[in-house]
Amino acid sequence: MSHISLSAAEEAGTYVIQLERELETTLKKVQKSMEAGIQAICQTVETKDPYVAGHQKRVSQLACTIAKEMGLSTWQIDGIRVAGMLHDIGKITVPTEILSKPGRLSHVDLAMIHDHPKVAFDILKNVDFDWPIARIVVQHHERLDGSGYPYGITGKDILLEARILAVADVVEAMSSNRPYRPALGIEEALAELARGDGTLFDSEVIRACEKVVNQRGFKVELSSSGV
């Protein structure tokens, strides 16, 4: 009787192991499909504005490095990575001539630019991510004092992931070439963060960003074209 029970237990154990392996394989396939989808979206944006796609990749990298420095969980960091890769997807609806305009933007131009987080939210809100990607993305231009856009939300009402993305976005943008100016450099980017410390940007996030740049040696990598 005990021999039969042992065999049944062994069989059950083998079945559980098999299920675990099948589940792991399925999860890897799902992850691979999601990554492929994200890359496809990035390529779509890149065909409209090559700067945006390169910018998103670099912001994602810096934001993840900041999040790791802050001790966030692997799950949160993965969400920040995905949000960073997609945060400017809403610019797909902004005319190319505005995105690449070398001169001063008009009020109409600025209105279209300021609308891109809401466009991104509408694109992403029904995608079944493991993280609140649409909310993170729509908030990445919000500022602690309410002076940001598109909704002017304040303080801790802004998701931590979005506050991290905001800092990474500013640092990368100021450190890179833009259609209307050459790169200002990472030192000037950090100075801009210091001017907005606690009013525009989260102080804890700034400290972590300064640490990864000044102590960890993180650099914003540019391609030969400045993209």
Q: Which role does the model predict for each range below?
A:
Residues 28, 35-227:
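Metal-dependent catalytic cores of enzymes that make or break cyclic nucleotides
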Residues 2-39, 43, 50:
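Amphipathic alpha-helical coiled-coil "transmission" helices that mediate dimerization
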